[in-house]
Amino acid sequence: MEFNKLELLIIRALKLNTNSNKKNSFYNKFLNLRNKVLNIQKNSLDQPSDAPSNNKKRNLDQPDNPNQKEPGKARKIIWSFIIIILVLGVLALIILSGFSFSATSLNAASFTENGTSSFKITTNTNQTRTIGGAPSTIYQRDSTLYVIYIENSFSGYYYSAIITDISVSNNTASVGNGSNTTGGSTSNLQKGLQIANLLVDGSGNVYKNKDNNGSTTSGTTTFSLNSNLTSAMKLQGWSSNQSMSLPTSYSFYTAASLVLSILPFILLIGIIYYSMRKMGQAGGGQDNVFSIGKSQAKLAKSTVLFSDVAGIEEEKEELIEIVDYLKRPDRYAAMGARVPKGVILYGPPGTGKTLLAKAVAGEAKVPFFQVSGSAFEDMLVGVGAKRVRDLFNKAVKSAPAIIFIDEIDSVGSKRGKFETTAGSLADQTLNQLLAEMDGFNTKTGVIVMAATNRLDVLDDALLRPGRFDRHIQVNLPDIKERVAILKIHSRNKNISETVDLEDIARRTPGFSGAQLENVLNEATLLAVRRNKKSIYTEELDEAIDRVIAGPAKKTRVISLEEKRQIAFHEAGHAIVGMYTKGSEVVEKITIIPRGQAAGYTLSVPEIQELSIQKKSDLLGMVAGLLGGRASEEINFGKEFISTGAANDLYKATNIVRAMVTQFGMSPNVGLAQYYPSEGTVNPYQSKNFSESTSQLIDKEIERIFKERYEYAYKIIKEHNKEVELIVESLLLLETIVKPQIDFIHKYKQLPKEALEKKKELEEKKKAEDLIRKAKKESEASSKEEKEMDVEKKVQKPSASSTEPTSKPKKAPSKESSSDKKK
């Protein structure tokens, strides 16, 4: 049992401060308490990622990071503040709207005294507005009274006027609806004879100081406003001859109206900003103008565990070790071990590279940032490098953490291949990635995982130790691994007990894990379509064919002659394969059209998943591919060969060219390799060998093709009887499988199913012939009866004579009379 320093200090204190009788009891209690704490820690580590109890608690074995902040906290605070401002703005709009009114809203208002230098206007809504400033002046033109006043506002004074018709009687100015009460069109007001100055003496009396004659008259003058009167208008200015322009309406400007004039712009800006943020979130942050330079990585939340991954046990163990290091780093630090800074997964598509990354995300109790390699680059220069920095900064704040870059070949390909501007810009992103992984500013506590299908195109600096220390190749599964994958994906499917998953795995060589999952899914859909409660071998066979060549096109109209030629073509593949050593075993032949293929032959290796292939195996594959064309030539002639061998010739050409230029299997060309690797192909670069060598390669390819075709032609010529039996079986059954093919090969006769189908068709043909014959006989008899009826009608009728009616016919009149007597 190992103790840390703190536990050793506690034990030492117990030994010093307790007597010998109590030492053991205290020590036992301490051990019990320590074991409980360790059990709690272990349970929290073993708890799955989707458990609801401790999802939000940090792992006890993980070191706390003081720099780590709750993600999105500042953003939530900012958005809360913006929402509060918007709500308060709307409330202010509602409240302040009650304090804004225009002159046209005045109803039965009156002037009352308010101090010595201001007037108060009271409206029908019991709202009061104070008009302050210099003493107002009354002008009169014709019979119109103009009350001019100055209003104090935020930025100075507004010149305002009240227009009303007036008739003076007993020092009282009565206001009525005159011709100018609505203002009419804009007119110039000349400064006319001054009638009176309105002064307030503080006692509530309004005096009329001067009249038309210049004399002063005392007494109170009252001004009442009519309810239908346009009562206030703003003067736009004074001219040099003291004239002024009066608009047709006027509104009072208050503090509320100023706020209301600005508030719509604030609301509009807030709505636009909010909409742009929502658009950025809806698009995953890709097209948001506010996050051009930010990383597009997301925190992955996966429910996939290592127990859900089958068929790649060695690769899984490599990643389990990394997850264990993240959970228990002290165990490795005690031994002086350094965790790999980077792990790259490479292999063919569909083999489970991304699935392994999901399992790491589900098992690890650390933040897992997932991003695609193409998400770094954008239309702006320098965005890629900026996003790389932002990604690693996020990961460091959450350390220990894992970064997973899917399809890293889009950002980490070899530098300087084409020496173009676009290439140099892409190199900036790669250089920043190299610096972040292992540069002067190396970030600790961050592990980088990546996946690619093309390891050969990646830059060497990216693959060196210190960046991607561990390279894990994920290959296609062998037969045992395919069985394990099928069992994993069949856990939630109702598969019949009669189905042999090992047989399905044997018939699917070269299938990836994704293809095997697709086979089971297609079989499930077919079972549902056929109203079956379980999945049987028939559905799985059809699903394999659908994955290989697509769905069957049974409604396609194909003539009998085309079917015969397709059958001879496929039979040629099968016969050459059966008589060629090292060739693949024929599992199935069909002439049902699927996809672009009019028919196909399914072959599997005799020995599953060979690590290497011999020259004889490759030559046997080429001969089998050429068997279809040879069979057509033998049975139809050179002038009647078809285009059905196009795909066969394409595959055979690739095999032969690889034998000559890559594998060194040609004695004339030699061992030199003239086949460039995939990552170094440059469309602007010429061939790296001479023209004479190129001609030699072409001649050698042509020689191998000629030899293999003659070999296939010879086999089909010798065993053409078997070819014809296979063709007849295909025309009867459309699809034959391995037991039926082996029966034909062994006994040189039709299999049982073909004979039964042939007998059924013969009986059907006999029945159709009988029906056709009976129909003809019935038609003939009916024709004879009609002729006899015609003859009877033509015969001479005679009551006394019993002789045959060979006499000439009577006159029509006599016949008609005798008929009448009858």
Curated annotation (Swiss-Prot):
Zn(2+) binds at residues 569, 573, 648. Keywords: ATP-binding, Cell membrane, Hydrolase, Membrane, Metal-binding, Metalloprotease, Nucleotide-binding, Protease, Transmembrane, Transmembrane helix, Zinc. Residues 44-71, 758-822 are annotated as: Disordered. Its main location: membrane. GO terms for biological process: protein catabolic process; proteolysis. Gene3D superfamilies: 1.10.8.60, P-loop containing nucleotide triphosphate hydrolases, Peptidase M41. Pfam families: AAA, AAA_lid_3, Peptidase_M41. Its EC number is 3.4.24.-. Residues 1-76, 273-822 are cytoplasmic. It is a multi-pass membrane protein. ATP binds at residues 347-354. Residues 44-54 have a biased composition (Polar residues). The chain crosses the membrane at residues 77-97, 252-272. One of its GO terms (molecular function) is ATP-dependent peptidase activity. It is an enzyme of class 3 (hydrolase). Binds 1 zinc ion per subunit. Its cofactor is Zn(2+). Residues 98-251 are extracellular. In the central section; belongs to the AAA ATPase family. This is ATP-dependent zinc metalloprotease FtsH. It comes from Malacoplasma penetrans (strain HF-2) (Mycoplasma penetrans). The lineage of its organism: Bacteria, Bacillati, Mycoplasmatota, Mycoplasmoidales, Mycoplasmoidaceae.
